[in-house]
Amino acid sequence: MAHKKGVGSSKNGRESQSKRLGVKLFGGEVAKAGNIIVRQRGTVHHPGENVGIGKDHTLYALVDGVVTFRRGKENRSFVSVKEVVAEA
């Protein structure tokens, strides 16, 4: 009878929590200064005009405006925020 009995719960519970990465504001959406646009690991998307980058590579808006995505050299993805000028 060389076998283990029920071990169950002590062998379970190893799945890590999701990190909620991805694009938070898509192209054409309005961003306020400080809004997170993309949460990512590494620079999948690079910061363009009016976009800052955090130490964890999070991209965020530096000004109020509309989010745009474009492809640059070597097929790199750049995220920019086009400032919307208020008409007086």
Swiss-Prot record:
Regions annotated as coiled coil: none
GO terms classed as biological process: translation
SUPFAM superfamilies in the cross-refs: Ribosomal L27 protein-like (SSF110324)
UniProt keyword Lipid metabolism, yes or no: no
UniProt-listed Pfam families: Ribosomal_L27
Gene this chain is encoded by: rpmA
PROSITE patterns (alphabetical): RIBOSOMAL_L27
NCBIfam families, A to Z: L27
Gene Ontology cellular component annotations, sorted alphabetically: cytosolic large ribosomal subunit
GO molecular function annotation: structural constituent of ribosome
Protein's recorded name: Large ribosomal subunit protein bL27
Family designation: Belongs to the bacterial ribosomal protein bL27 family.
